[in-house]
Amino acid sequence: MSDINEQHRTSIFPYSAKKRRVLISGDSFAEGQTDTRHRFDYQINKLSNKYHATSIGCGGYGPSQQILFAKRFITYLRKDDVFILLTCGNDFGDISRKTIFGRSKPHLTNSGNRIEIKPPDDSFLYYFRDKSFLLGYSLQFLDAYNMKWNFSDQEVRDSHNIYCSFVESYFNNLKSKNIIPVIFLHSLKNTRFCNELELKLHSKNINFVNLSDLLSNKVYLSEDNFHWNERGNLKIAKQIVNYIDNKLEN
């Protein structure tokens, strides 16, 4: 079972000295938007006694923040352990957004082929956001109302370039430590230029698996028709176990 402390996230990978550790980071899917016993990290640990998986996430903040959040746990990974970045199709819109849920957040920019992390806005408005219910609710409502969902072709391509460059840099760092990094893509069926994205990942020698077709069937979705239900979590758990098994055999 995953033993991460849900409140403080301080306990990770206990009792796994003889097992290969699998750290999974991502958005709300990785947070486990389902009954605890149906989370796919729990399912992985039930499917195989060779692995100890723990899934973490920070929904809505984009892949860059998912990686940054995971950094504090990377130190628990050893040689030949596995790091998985679970990337949803809507994560690419989160890359360059400056706010989420009425909160200012770090965001990535691409200027002159140089990727930069811009810090969050530290204005008094956002400082008092968490100290006033009315202000917090108002900012969250306005953020949801004004949230951008339609992006130009250039914006989509820019987000893909930022994603690939940021991930490439971090994955190369993990490889230098003999940690196995891989991306699991999903919910990309309606994402423009997804074929171009896959070609970019291939060109940068980034290992990835696209689960979009596999998980598109609604029988794998929960009542919100977005997150995975018990069957969906079990499906991806089996895919992860099979991938790691095959990767280690080769």
Show where each model-derived region lies.
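Conserved beta-strand elements of the Class I
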Residues: 23-25, 54, 82-83
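Histidine-centered active-site loop/cap adjacent to the catalytic His
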Residues: 224-250
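Conserved, well-ordered alpha-helix/loop/beta-strand core segments that scaffold catalytic motifs
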Residues: 81-93, 141-215
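Membrane/wall-proximal cationic-aromatic binding patches
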Residues: 1-47, 215-219
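Interaction-surface signature
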Residues: 63-155
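Second-shell loop/turn segments in exported
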Residues: 28-31, 55-56, 156-157, 222-226
